[in-house]
Amino acid sequence: SLPNGPRNRVWNTGSGKAEFTIHPIPHIELADDQYLMATVRSHDQYNTTIYGLDDRYRGIYGERRVVMMNPQDIADAGFTEGQIVDLTSHFEDGERHAPRFVIVRQDVPRRCVFTYFPEANPLVPARSVARLSNTPTSKSVVISMRPAE
């Protein structure tokens, strides 16, 4: 088998032990009608290659244009499960829009929503990137939603 330091409990660090770095999570102010969106993969997906429309991890079948929401957030916003909504992201350089996402009830943290990528990629601001890696901040996008037109 290939060498695997952690599996063999070998840590190539100055201390000879596993070392962890802790990064504080920035506080993001959300307006009353805003949520923090993270994009995720489905079970039938490898990176951006999509093999099917089913996500057995989350019990979602036959659809990928979904916004997964906390049940209490759905009720508080006056939405219903299965309702079709348009999503808008908000960043310093303007707004981006992605139409016709289906609300799906999931056990996610309050004021946070999950969407699949690449379907929600248009909402991710190209200029919003991680400081060191320069990768898009796809796990931290401020959005709002309204009933679909």
What do these predicted regions represent?
Residues 1-56:
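Long, low-complexity segments enriched in small/aliphatic residues
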Residues 48, 53-149:
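Long, contiguous, secondary-structure-rich segments that constitute the structural scaffold
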